[in-house]
Amino acid sequence: PADVPSRAWLKFEQALAWRGWDQLDLRGQTALDLGCAPGGATYALIQRGMNVLGIDTGEMDPRVLDLAKAQGVRFDHWRTAAGRLNLTALPREVALLLCDINLAPPLVIPEIQRVQDAVQARRLILTIKLNTPALEDRAHEFIDTIRDFAPAPVFATQLAGNRREICVCAG
């Protein structure tokens, strides 16, 4: 839709539908969104009634804050890099961990694992960027690495909204 802050909204909604998670009642549960700015996926989470902790050094679209107020859900934006997170300050009950950070998999996957080890989210939706042929050739390696720390089962595909990236869903 034209009124959403970014393309991440579409990628998140497609991931939910692909796994059949679009029918889940997520109201009142907590999501942790790594790489949240400008707020497309966060917007979708809030539309579904989730409380969201967003992690990103970037600015959030004001529509995200407005929607959170209108929906009566909590949205906190920590303006820090995922690698600088104080893990002990993260919520302990995380239903969904999202990550859509524009970094190469060898840089971002260890950060996802570090956060997942701390919060033990029940489900993960990850966008893994494969911006070069060399990274594309290693896609199976990256998925196997994610399988080592993510809740089972782990699935990966390229959704219609994905460009040079794959969607990995776990849990």
Where are these regions (language model features)?
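Conserved class I S-adenosyl-L-methionine
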Residues: L26-A37, A44
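Conserved acidic residues
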Residues: Q29, A95, R122
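Short acidic, S/G/P-rich loop/turn micro-motifs used as interaction or catalytic elements
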Residues: A41, R84, L103-P105, N131-P133
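S-adenosyl-L-methionine
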Residues: P1-R27, Q47, N51-L96, A104-P106
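Active-site proximal loops enriched in glycine and acidic residues that flank catalytic Cys/His/Asp
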Residues: D56, R79, I101, I128-L130, ...
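C-terminal substrate-binding/active-site "lid" region of AdoMet-derived donor-dependent transferases
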Residues: I109-G171
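Conserved proline-anchored active-site loop of SAM-dependent methyltransferases
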Residues: L34-P38, L96-P105
